A protein has these predicted regions:
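A secondary-structure boundary/capping signal
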Residues: 1, 27-28, 67-68, 100
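GHKL-family ATP-binding catalytic core of two-component histidine kinases
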Residues: 8-9, 68
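Hydrophobic helical membrane-anchoring modules
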Residues: 14-17, 47, 54-55, 78-148
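A short acidic, helix-capping loop that chelates divalent metal ions and anchors anionic groups
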Residues: 33-35, 71, 105-110
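A conserved catalytic-core signature of glycosyltransferases
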Residues: 35, 39, 43, 59-62, ...
Length: 148
């Protein structure tokens, strides 16, 4: 969850209702309280990312997400990975669900995002994700008790 107070921890309860049936449950910021320009950038970036990943996720930037630990442990980490969390979870043959959550105007801090790091860098990261997806090996390490 972000520290800018644009979402509320209370909405985690909405996500937790479905975590038994899905490996990732994530929020979609309903009625976003951001500027027109920020919302436009987000729609463009999410649309392109969705086209490249085919994950169907509307709002990957929503900070409210809950996921199973076993899946979280298998995520490859890299700069900008947060944009691809749903796609990386889907590579593990998981199921995801998106749920509308509340969104509030920013009351604290300033955004660290601007045109360059909201559009250009994620654009390039999409190609890196596609490269990685072609080479991804979905595996699980089983428990093996050698000492009984």
């Amino acid at each position: 969850m972000d520290a800018d107070l644009q979402t509320t921890p209370e909405d985690f309860n909405l996500l937790l209702k479905d975590i038994a049936d899905y490996q990732l449950v994530m929020g979609i910021r309903a009625n976003r309280k951001d500027s027109f320009f920020k919302n436009l950038q987000s729609k463009i970036a999410n649309g392109f990312r969705r086209m490249m990943t085919h994950d169907g996720v509307q709002d990957t930037g929503c900070p409210l997400k809950v996921l199973h630990t076993a899946y979280a442990k298998r995520i490859p980490f890299f700069t900008g990975m947060h944009r691809f969390l749903p796609a990386l979870i889907l590579l593990q043959d998981a199921k995801i669900k998106q749920i509308p959550v509340r969104h509030f105007p920013r009351v604290a801090g300033t955004s660290k995002y601007h045109l360059w790091n909201r559009l250009v860098s994620p654009f390039l990261d999409c190609f890196a994700y596609r490269w990685m997806k072609k080479r991804y090996i979905n595996y699980r390490v089983g428990d093996n008790n050698l000492m009984e």
